[in-house]
Regions:
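PAS-family sensory modules
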Residues: 1-24, 98-136
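Sensory/regulatory domains in signal-transduction proteins
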Residues: 20, 27-121
Length: 136
């Protein structure tokens, strides 16, 4: 069995399992965004703090704040319509020059999914938010 240091995902596997991820560089710019998140986010500024506010915990929406919060739960909200709440965790990359935010929409009602134009195929297979679609 491989050691934990050898576990990894291909780019395609990562994109499929985390379609709402964000990569934020040390300059605060959003470098990459998962396909599902990119589809529901309107065009806008490249800066993380310009596009999102951090709801929980109370912190500045910048790289330093994200790096200090590594591995812990956070909740974000987009600053533009449609307003999207996302929850997930921050993973500081080994080189320290970027952080991955592994996110999923914070869905509390099926209407939230419908309002964003999302479907089952927009979520990672492991994402429990999809269960709401089946509960209604």
């Amino acid at each position: 069995m491989p050691s934990s240091a050898e576990i990894g995902l291909t780019a395609a596997q990562f994109e499929a399992e985390f379609p709402f991820y964000l990569q934020v560089g040390c300059d605060g710019a959003i470098g990459r965004m998962g396909a599902s998140l990119a589809r529901i986010m309107p065009p806008g500024p490249a800066g993380f703090g310009e596009r999102f506010r951090v709801i929980r915990p109370e912190m500045t929406a910048d790289f330093a704040g994200l790096a200090a919060w590594g591995g812990k739960l956070l909740v974000l909200e987009s600053r533009f319509e449609p307003v999207v709440r996302l929850r997930g965790s921050v993973q500081l990359q080994p080189d320290g020059r970027s952080a991955l935010l592994l996110l999923s929409p914070w869905i509390t009602r099926v209407e939230d999914i419908e309002a964003l134009g999302l479907s089952i195929g927009d979520f990672g297979a492991h994402d429990p938010a999809v269960d709401l679609l089946f509960l209604q």
